[in-house]
Structures are given as structure tokens and as C-alpha cells.
UniProtKB/Swiss-Prot annotation:
UniProt subunit comment: Homodimer. Heterotetramer of two MnmE and two MnmG subunits.
GO biological process: tRNA methylation; tRNA wobble uridine modification
Record keywords, A-Z: Cytoplasm, FAD, Flavoprotein, NAD, tRNA processing
Protein name per UniProt: tRNA uridine 5-carboxymethylaminomethyl modification enzyme MnmG
Cellular compartment(s): Cytoplasm
Biological function: NAD-binding protein involved in the addition of a carboxymethylaminomethyl (cmnm) group at the wobble position (U34) of certain tRNAs, forming tRNA-cmnm(5)s(2)U34.
Family: Belongs to the MnmG family.
Binding residues annotated for NAD(+), in chain numbering: 276-290
Length: 632
């Protein structure tokens, strides 16, 4: 194929899934000329697996994306068909918002947002190779011979890199949902010296809604109380006309069908070579691993308002098509169901993430960034969070500005990226609340208070969003201060109220703020005993006031740990340090440090196999020579 010189750009993003959409929008909105190339324009921000956004940890990521100026939260708020707050009976650290998406509306809305964006060109094309000169990425070449030059490239290829779909004994080259795979680019990345791994993920069958007997399933409705992912979505926009999901279960017959066909299951026959996700196992894997369980939950999730397709969550499988049909017909409510799409597994190449800097720039090739499933993660939200950060950092580098690296104490996005570049992953990585040490301060409700300032500083958060954030922040601070001034006296009314709550009465007067610290007392109950504020408070302000006061002691302890971490993050490790030359370091520590090349003492301390004694030796070694402090 003859090459020709096509247009030049500042940033080129390869792949328009959830990572690529965020990366391209972020770069363009920060003022750099951006090109977004993708294999098929009809699959921009497509949902090839579950038609949903959010859930534990993931929902917080969507809020963080929004607080930084990203798009995912706004997009799902326009296109959901059901919204639910999960874990409402638990503490605020694990509450999570989850939306059922109209997957076609979601993709169409995101594509149109991209098309309307200034500084951003969306184009269909298959990238076959990168233009690399003297170890620096300078652009891309497509299958049609177009050579696009740029100052930075972000690869967000999802599961397309040398993708292969597997259904029973059948295995063929394909991207997700029978789209075209990216073979040339996958091979080229290997040739450039990047270490590549092979992962696997899977998806369940889709069934026809009109053939489901919903009368024998359990209805799962959405919430009546307004909730949104984006801080800019008003309560008045809340969709009260929501679609339910439905709950059913596998049974012993289902399990017998799977058991007798395990000899045809690709994950047990050796056809599947890639490593699968531990936290999203196939149904055949669940039957083997949890043989004592008589049944497994299945959620029937509509894929949109204008389609009959229903996603059978919990039934991910790569068993042969005939077995999938038999399996479905054994499930209550699905006895006569028509399968519209067969479940499948997909294997794909991933860039081993220890080759990345915390900015998501590769260490091997300068100005080349990777994000999303290409880095070994699973999930749309994880992909979008990485895409946003890669796009931001590519733009900042071009502008000659300091990079934006979120710490573990800043957000789940920071936890995820640090896990990837510091610890790596040997299976598709999924964000969990348990991965965050500071989850009490990384909550769904306070992502704006944590990250809006950063988003505004880099030019992504627009003035209207920033002004609304400042108003909310001031209102929270003012109300906390007001509750610290008013006293509640042990009147008959107060004592009678406490008696109805089964709580101890007051001996002396108490500040309203301290009264609210009692676990059984709500803000509304405190409010009845003190004068009302001058202006009625937004429910989100009240929620924030209540959480900050009730959990003040725990939050204070967490913040003390954060400050200690910041001091360690401030101790930078010089580049190209020779760990083999440091006497006293354990052999494993030398190997791990040499491989990962941590940038700070804090990052080094989180590497598996590097113990506190190794860190002490490393700090002494650096302090005897030169130690660079992190700017700011």
C-alpha cells in the first residue's frame, strides 16, 4: 500500500470506545487539535457487553470523571432507562449508583457529542502501525495508506487487538460483537518492543423479551428518588418512567446441562489461552468453582427502549450454541425463550501495564499513551477513567505543562492507575471498593469536592460547573459552621423525642453538630430543634453535611494517613537508578524495582516483594546522593 501524507494533529486517539471517547474529548476541550480514528463509526462508545453504567466503585469512577470535566456521567444521565442507588442500607463509603442504559441511545448520544466538539475530528480508519522516530511516537498509518502525523498518540483499542471470538469448538478472528479485529497494530506493538499479554473476557446470550415469562420472575424497579451521575444534571431531568429489570435463577437442571457438556467448554478444553476475569466468571466456571451452590442469580436486563433484546446478566458463557439454548430453556421464565445472540468469549492482546508511567505514557516509546482494556482492565468505567487521564496528560505534555497524576487518596481512578503501573495485573483488572485504603474519603457523594478544582485548573471543568461547585462547597461549610453555633437544650420536647428513638436523654445542652453525631439522629431531626437556615438547603448539601459530621472522627484518621502518604509521595526517586548497585537490597526487591522503575518512595513501597527494610535502605541510598522533591 502506497502511503500518502494526510493531515497533521496534536493528538491522535486510536479507538472510539469508552476510553477513546473520553481521551479525545478531554484533549480537544483542553485546546489541542485532536483526531479520533476508529474501525467502525457505528460502534462509537458501543456497549458490547452489559448495558449498564456504574455499580460498586465503578459508579464512583463515573462521578470522578464528571468532576474532572469528562463526559460519561452526562451521557448516561441522558440515556438511562433505570437508575438505582445500591447499598443504601450500608455506610456512605460503599453506596453506589448504577444505571441501566439504552445502549443504542448511549452510543448515538456520545457519537453526536464527539461530532459537535470543536478541535475534534472523528474518522473511520484502521490503524496498522505507528510512526516512531528516535524512540518518539510521531503519528499513525492507516490501512488506506494515510500517514497522520501528531505530537502524541493514545491507543484505546479495547478488545480488538488480535481479537478472537470463541463459541464452543468455534474460534475465529474478530473484535467484540463480530466487529473487525485490529491485527496489524497488535503485531506492530510487539515489533516496537512492548511486552504483550493475552487476556480473555466473555458475554452472555441475548434473548427476545416477548418470549420471556416475566410472571415467574422477581421485578427489580428503579428508584423514585432522583439521583444522577453528573453534578450538572438537575433533579427536574430525572426520568420517573423507568424500565424494570427482572430476577431469576439457575437451578440443578441448568447445572447438570453444564456439567455434562464441560468437555465441550473452551475454557476447559484448552481452546481458550487468555486469562479470564476472576470477578466476572463464566457460568461454567461458577458451576465448577462453587459446586455446592444450588442456584445462581440471573438478572434480565433490557438493552433499550426500541429493541426486544434482553441481556442475561450472570450467564456469561462460551459453551457451544446448542448447549446455550438447552441451558436457557432450563431456567424459570426462559423455558420458551428465543436466543437472539449467542454468548461468547473473546481473547485479545493487552499491553503489560508495568511498562507505563503514572501518566499512562509508555516508558518504551515517548509520547505514546495507552488506556482502557488495552491496559488489562475490564469494564466501561475503568476504561473511561483511564482514557480521560491519558487524554489530559497527552494534552498537558504538548502544552508544556506539568502532568496530572491522581494519588490513591484523590480518587478510585488514582487507585486503579497506581495498581496497574505499580503492581501490574495477571488477569482483567476490575475496580473494587476493597482496593482503596481510603474508601471513606473516596465516596460517591464527594467526588466534586475532591476533583473539581483539578479539573478547572487544567481547563476541562467549565465556568458554569465550577461556579455551581463553589456554591455547594460554601453552603456545606456554612451549614456545618451554623450547626456548631446552635445549642440544643434538654427540654421536655427533646427528651421525649430521644425516648421515642430509644436513645439516652440529654443531661446538659449540646451543640447541634454534636447532637447530629449520634448514629440514630438524622439532620432533619436535628433541624426541628434549632432555627432554620436563612435559605432552604439543597438535599445534596444536607447529605454532605450529615456525612461529614457523622463520620468526622473516621475521616480525620483517614486524612492523617493521607498526609503521611503525601510525605512519601514527595520523596522522588531519580530516573535510571541502578538498583543492582544498592548494597543490602533483597534480590527480589532489586528485580521488582528494576522492572517497575517507581517514581516515588511511596510507589516503591506498594510494590509486591519490596519490604519496609528495602525501602529504608533505598531512602538512605537516595539521601546520600541526590533526592528530587515533587514540585508543589
Amino acid at each position: 500500500m502506497n502511503q500518502y501524507q494526510a493531515e497533521s494533529y496534536d493528538v491522535i486517539v486510536v479507538g472510539a470506545g469508552h476510553a477513546g471517547s473520553e481521551a479525545a474529548l478531554a484533549a480537544a476541550r483542553m485546546g489541542v487539535k485532536t483526531l479520533l480514528l476508529t474501525i467502525n463509526l457505528d460502534m462509537v462508545a458501543f456497549m458490547p457487553c452489559n448495558p449498564s453504567v456504574g455499580g460498586p466503585a465503578k459508579g464512583v469512577v463515573v462521578r470522578e470523571i464528571d468532576a474532572l470535566g469528562g463526559e460519561m456521567g452526562k451521557n448516561i444521565d441522558k440515556t438511562y432507562i433505570q437508575m438505582r442507588m445500591l447499598n443504601t442500607g450500608k455506610g456512605p463509603a460503599v453506596r453506589a449508583l448504577r444505571a441501566q442504559a439504552d445502549k443504542h441511545a448511549y452510543a448515538t448520544e456520545m457519537k453526536h457529542t464527539i461530532e459537535k466538539e470543536e478541535n475534534l475530528t472523528l474518522r473511520q480508519g484502521i490503524v496498522e502501525e505507528l510512526i516512531v522516530e528516535d524512540g518518539v511516537c510521531r503519528g499513525v498509518v492507516t490501512s488506506t495508506g494515510a500517514a497522520y502525523r501528531s505530537q502524541a498518540v493514545v491507543i484505546t483499542a479495547g478488545t480488538a487487538l488480535r481479537g478472537e471470538i470463541i463459541i464452543g469448538e468455534l474460534k475465529y478472528s474478530s473484535g467484540p460483537n463480530n466487529s473487525q479485529p485490529s491485527v496489524g497494530l497488535a503485531n506492530h506493538l510487539k515489533e516496537l518492543g512492548l511486552e504483550i499479554d493475552r487476556f480473555k473476557t466473555g458475554t452472555p446470550p441475548r434473548v427476545k423479551s416477548s418470549t420471556i415469562d416475566y410472571s415467574v420472575t422477581e421485578e427489580q424497579p428503579g428508584d423514585k428518588e432522583p439521583n444522577h451521575f453528573s453534578y450538572s444534571t438537575p433533579d427536574s431531568a430525572y426520568n420517573q418512567n423507568q424500565e424494570p429489570c427482572w430476577l431469576t435463577y439457575t437451578n440443578e437442571t441448568t447445572h447438570e446441562i453444564i456439567q455434562k457438556n464441560l468437555h465441550r467448554a473452551p475454557m476447559f478444553t484448552g481452546i481458550v489461552e487468555g486469562v479470564g476475569a476472576r470477578y466476572c466468571p463464566s457460568i461454567e466456571d461458577k458451576i465448577v468453582r462453587f459446586a455446592d451452590k444450588p442456584r445462581h442469580q440471573l438478572f434480565l436486563e433490557p438493552e433499550g427502549l426500541n429493541t426486544e433484546e434482553v441481556y442475561v446478566q450472570g450467564l456469561s458463557t462460551s459453551l457451544p450454541e446448542d448447549v446455550q439454548t438447552e441451558m436457557l430453556h432450563s431456567i424459570e421464565g426462559l423455558e420458551k425463550v428465543e436466543m437472539m445472540r449467542t454468548g461468547y468469549a473473546i481473547e485479545y492482546d493487552v499491553v503489560v501495564p508495568h511498562q507505563l508511567r503514572p501518566t499512562l505514557e509508555t516508558k518504551v516509546i515517548e509520547n505514546l499513551y495507552t488506556a482502557g482494556q488495552t491496559n488489562g482492565t475490564s469494564g466501561y468505567e475503568e476504561a473511561a477513567g483511564q482514557g480521560l487521564m491519558a487524554g489530559i496528560n497527552a494534552a498537558l505534555k504538548i502544552q508544556g505543562k506539568e502532568p496530572l497524576v491522581l494519588k490513591r487518596s484523590d480518587g478510585y481512578i488514582g487507585v486503579m492507575i497506581d495498581d496497574l503501573v505499580t503492581k501490574g495485573t495477571n488477569e482483567p483488572y476490575r475496580l473494587l471498593t476493597s482496593r482503596a485504603e481510603y474508601r471513606l474519603i473516596l465516596r460517591h457523594d464527594n467526588a466534586d469536592l475532591r476533583l473539581t478544582e483539578m479539573g478547572h485548573e487544567i481547563g476541562l471543568v467549565k465556568e458554569e460547573q465550577y461556579a455551581a461547585y463553589l456554591v455547594k462547597k460554601a453552603a456545606v461549610e456554612a451549614e456545618i459552621a451554623r450547626l456548631g453555633k446552635h445549642r440544643i437544650k434538654p427540654t421536655k420536647e427533646v427528651q421525649a423525642f430521644l425516648e421515642t428513638k430509644g436513645a439516652a436523654g440529654l443531661k446538659d445542652g449540646i451543640l447541634a453538630r454534636d447532637f447530629l453525631k449520634r448514629p440514630e439522629i438524622s439532620y432533619q431531626e436535628v433541624a426541628q430543634f434549632i432555627p432554620a437556615p436563612e435559605e432552604a438547603l439543597d438535599p445534596k448539601v444536607i447529605e454532605q453535611v450529615e456525612i461529614q459530621i457523622k463520620y468526622e472522627g473516621y475521616i480525620k484518621k483517614a486524612m492523617e494517613k493521607v498526609e503521611k502518604l503525601k510525605r512519601m509521595e514527595a520523596k522522588r526517586i531519580p530516573e535510571n537508578i541502578d538498583y543492582q548497585a544498592i548494597n543490602g537490597l533483597a534480590t527480589e526487591a532489586k528485580q521488582k524495582l528494576q522492572k517497575i522503575q517507581p517514581e516515588t518512595i511511596a510507589q516503591a513501597s506498594r510494590i509486591s516483594g519490596v519490604n519496609p527494610a528495602d525501602i529504608s535502605i533505598l531512602m538512605v541510598y537516595i539521601e546520600q546522593g541526590k533526592i528530587a522533591k515533587v514540585q508543589g
